[in-house]
Amino acid sequence: MKVAFQRVAAAAMASCLALMACLVFVNVVLRYGFGAGIAASEELSRLLFVWMVFIGATAAYPMGEHMAFTSLLLKLRTRPRVFAAATALIRALVLLACVLVAWGAWQQFVVGLDSHSVVIGYPAALLPLPALLSSVAIGVMALVELVRREPLDFGHATDLE
């Protein structure tokens, strides 16, 4: 499941990045070569960038690739009960952060339903939508890990210390 999710997320991020690069390149060529550019390229690039960032954040969570300070946790591995309590506390804090981000993103989403972007005309609610979806997805993953009492996945962070 994780592998399929990672592939879909990587493809979505690559598509966003490729489209942004093409839009900016074409806009630069048109603007400096012909004196006129694509008005929607900046707005669409901004929207794609926001989506790409939150897709990446969501894809990084199950792999344990978010930045973490593991110095203390690595020392706690020798004390299983303390390590389990620290793991539960970390997951609860992640869940709290997701709730707060989702709450704020939902409020911005509702406000954005009535307004539209200036150039393209898409609903402004599309800008906070990836934050809402990402926080819900990460929150569900953190809740499942908390309920299952899964040990922390240090990802590649242990290689750096």
List the predicted regions and their residue ranges.
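Alpha-helical transmembrane segments and membrane-interface helix-loop junctions
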Residues: 1-161
